[in-house]
Swiss-Prot record:
UniProt main location, coarse: cytoplasm
Biological-process GO terms, alphabetical: mismatch repair; RNA catabolic process
Protein known as: Ribonuclease H2 subunit C
Organism: Saccharomyces cerevisiae (strain ATCC 204508 / S288c)
Keywords: Cytoplasm, Nucleus
Quaternary structure and interacting proteins, as annotated: The RNase 2 complex is a heterotrimer composed of the catalytic subunit RNH201 and of the non-catalytic subunits RNH202 and RNH203.
Length: 110
């Protein structure tokens, strides 16, 4: 997807948020809550820091009608499910942890 797309709603976002290919060190997700705002950028998945958007942010980002925000390669969404379980400490479970703890809502238009 390119930023110069005229009608963003006509495009399909090209990643599946439930199956990110994230590997490596992660943020600690155990304190995340339902409806927390997060963002997905490349292979990073982090909670959004509270901040007041500047006027320059408005000129470099586009907003989908469903509320998802496209800014460069960043997609913003909200946590829609939080499933707590004990961390097993293996690399494979890092990916499973991300898939089970965090879901993005209304990112892919259908």
């Amino acid at each position: 997807m390119t930023k110069d797309a005229v009608n963003l709603d006509a495009y399909t976002v090209s990643f599946m948020p439930f199956y990110t290919e994230y590997q490596g060190p992660t943020e600690e997700f155990k304190d995340y809550k339902f409806e927390d705002t997060i963002y997905f950028r490349g292979k990073e998945l982090k909670r959004e820091k509270s901040a007041t958007p500047s006027s320059s942010d408005n000129t470099t980002s586009n907003t989908f009608s469903n509320g998802a925000i496209l800014s460069g390669n960043t997609i913003t969404g909200k946590i829609v499910s939080v499933n707590n379980y004990e961390r097993e400490g293996t690399d494979r479970n890092e990916l499973a942890r991300l898939q089970e703890l965090i879901s993005l809502i209304d990112v892919i238009n259908q």
